[in-house]
Structure formats: structure tokens, C-alpha cells
């Protein structure tokens, strides 16, 4: 292990309930020189003015960090040792405009231009799903069009919401229109519930996306599916966007638009672990809404899924 790599603060150095609540109790880094030294970073985007039902995900980054205090460095299931090979830190939150959604989107894109300019691979704590659009805009400038693994209860391909083109339910329609995605390398997993028409998921299919509805995932391991996903999206840079409402509300009630019949926490880990070997260039975990998360379990799940994302990044060694 490189002694110069940042390490999470251990439970014997500071009690788990003490200290500053950064993600995994990692150092908080902001200076240009420190940013240049990072390989990956956790960054919060506390935006929820793009939501259509229950707000509150502006508090998601803070609570995910608070629930991350029990996460330890080594992944005992997969052998991943991310802190042995990558320099990782928490670089704080994007200072969004909470009164103007379009201005907030502009600010997010600008901030991710800066983050990517330091050579950092971003692991984003949302925030509602609107935030993925400006992140993808910034990523295209660096990596070109990307493949996408998108876990969600909803396709987020509405043309508009109340006449607005930018909202958490329009993100991937805009991403296609702006040529941000390599549409033949996109998979959406966990889509479910009711639609306005019988063809609501077909727009995605017509673009070349593979759509895996939640019912196709019931009562089974998703390891075989993820082998197919790797075949579909591999061969170039890939972004992973994980909406917590992809998980059944029995496990993740703290979200803005819950839908029954969703994925399990085990399936969520299978999906993320199944991304190992892909050329991941960024990840996000969105739509955790702490006001509806009375036990903290949704934030705890979000924190652990972000750790699992860290564990499958390119360059992570296994012990």
C-alpha cells in the first residue's frame, strides 16, 4: 500500500460517531495541487428542484456521508482494495443555485469541467436525477459519447414535464438529443410501475437501449444479466447512474418517487459488482431523500453502493 494514498479514518483513531462527516471519513480536499493528486473523488450535488413529487434529496449528500462512517477500506466479498491503489478524497459539494434550475445545471456542468480537468473520476452523491445531464455534458467534452448503465424505476425519457425540458424525468431524453450517449451501449435496469401509454418504455428501445424491466429480475440472481450487460456496453467509456428508487421501497423508502416491486439490495450489489472490468469514467447515486428515510437505511444503502462503485473502478487492485 502506498503510504501517500489517502485512507479512511479508522474506528480506533476516532470513534465512528465522532469527527467530520466526510464520505467514509476521508480527507476533505479542495486546493488545486491536492485535486491534481487524486484519482477519484466523492462529490455532492445537493439539488432537488428538478423533482416532480417528494422533494428532500438536497439533503442526500449530507446524510449519505453521515451513514458512511461504518464503511471500512477492504471489500471482504470481492477482495477489492481501492485505497491500496487509488488516491481518493471527498471534495465537498457543488454550490448550486437552489432558486433557478437552469442556472444550477449550468453551474454543475462548469464544476464537472473543473473536476474532470484535474483528471479526477467523479463519484457523485445526489441530488435528484436532473444532475446527471450536466455531468454527462461535461463528460462528453473529455471522453466523447459514452455507454450507460442506468438503474431506475423510471426511464427518465419524458419529452417535458409541465412544459419544462429540464427536470429529473427528462434527463436521458435530453442526453440522446444532445448526442451524449452511444445509444447502442445503453442498458436500463429495473423499470417498472404504470405508464401513460402502453408504449412508454418503447422510446428507449427505439434508440437502441436495452430495457430490463423489474419483473425480468424477480426471484433471480442478476449475475447472468450483468454478463450480457458487459457485452452490450463494453468497448468504450461507460457511465453508471443509479437511482435509489430502482430498489424496492421495502429497502429504500427514502426517495421521492417510490415504486413497489423493485430490485433487492443484493441485486443492486450484483449490478454494480457486475460492472467490474468496464471502462467506468464516472458514477452517480441519486434520489436519496432523507426526510422520508426515518431509519437512515436508504442513506446507508446509498453510501454502501457508492463504495461498491469505487471498488469496480479501473485500476482497483484485489487482494
Curated annotation (Swiss-Prot):
Name the reaction it catalyses.
4-guanidinobutanoate + H2O = urea + 4-aminobutanoate
What are the binding positions for Mn(2+) 2 in this chain? 152, 154, 243, 245
Q: List the disulfide bonds.
A: none
The effect of pH on activity is described as:
Optimum pH is 9.5.
Origin organism is Pseudomonas aeruginosa (strain ATCC 15692 / DSM 22644 / CIP 104116 / JCM 14847 / LMG 12228 / 1C / PRS 101 / PAO1)
Which positions in this protein are listed as binding Mn(2+) 1?
129, 152, 156
Has UniProt tagged this entry with the keyword Metal-binding? yes
What remark does the entry make about the cofactor?
A: Binds 2 manganese ions per subunit.
Instruction: State the gene name recorded for this protein.
Output: gbuA
Protein name, as recorded: Guanidinobutyrase
| Family to which the UniProt record says this protein belongs | Belongs to the arginase family. Agmatinase subfamily.
Q: Effect of altering residue 161 to Y? A: Loss of activity
Amino acid at each position: 500500500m502506498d503510504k501517500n494514498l489517502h485512507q479512511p479514518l479508522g474506528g480506533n483513531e476516532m470513534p465512528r460517531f465522532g469527527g467530520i462527516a466526510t464520505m467514509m471519513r476521508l480527507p476533505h480536499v479542495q486546493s488545486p495541487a491536492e485535486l491534481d493528486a487524486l484519482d477519484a473523488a466523492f462529490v455532492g450535488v445537493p439539488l432537488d428542484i428538478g423533482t416532480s413529487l417528494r422533494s428532500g434529496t438536497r439533503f442526500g449528500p449530507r446524510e449519505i456521508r453521515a451513514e458512511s462512517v461504518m464503511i471500512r477500506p477492504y471489500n471482504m466479498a470481492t477482495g477489492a482494495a481501492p485505497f491500496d491503489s487509488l488516491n481518493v478524497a471527498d471534495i465537498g459539494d457543488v454550490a448550486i443555485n437552489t432558486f433557478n434550475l437552469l442556472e444550477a445545471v449550468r453551474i454543475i456542468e462548469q464544476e464537472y469541467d473543473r473536476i474532470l480537468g484535474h483528471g479526477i473520476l467523479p463519484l457523485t452523491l445526489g441530488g435528484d436525477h436532473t444532475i446527471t445531464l450536466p455531468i454527462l455534458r461535461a463528460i462528453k467534452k473529455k471522453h466523447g459519447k459514452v455507454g450507460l448503465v442506468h438503474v431506475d424505476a423510471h426511464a427518465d425519457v419524458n419529452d417535458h414535464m409541465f412544459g419544462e425540458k429540464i427536470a429529473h424525468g427528462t434527463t436521458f431524453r435530453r442526453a440522446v438529443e444532445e448526442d451524449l450517449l452511444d445509444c447502442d451501449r445503453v442498458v436500463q435496469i429495473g423499470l417498472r410501475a404504470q405508464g401513460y401509454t402502453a408504449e412508454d418504455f418503447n422510446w428507449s428501445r427505439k434508440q437502441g437501449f436495452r430495457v430490463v424491466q423489474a419483473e425480468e429480475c424477480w426471484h433471480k440472481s442478476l449475475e447472468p444479466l450483468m454478463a450480457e450487460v458487459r457485452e452490450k456496453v463494453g468497448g468504450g467509456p461507460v457511465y453508471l447512474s443509479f437511482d435509489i428508487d430502482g430498489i424496492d421501497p421495502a429497502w429504500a423508502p427514502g426517495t421521492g418517487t417510490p415504486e413497489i416491486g423493485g430490485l433487492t439490495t443484493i441485486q443492486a450489489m450484483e449490478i454494480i459488482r457486475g460492472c467490474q472490468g468496464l471502462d467506468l469514467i464516472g458514477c452517480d447515486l441519486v434520489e436519496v431523500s432523507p426526510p422520508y428515510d426515518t431509519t437512515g437505511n436508504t442513506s446507508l444503502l446509498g453510501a454502501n453502493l457508492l463504495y461498491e462503485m469505487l471498488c469496480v473502478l479501473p485500476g482497483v487492485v484485489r487482494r
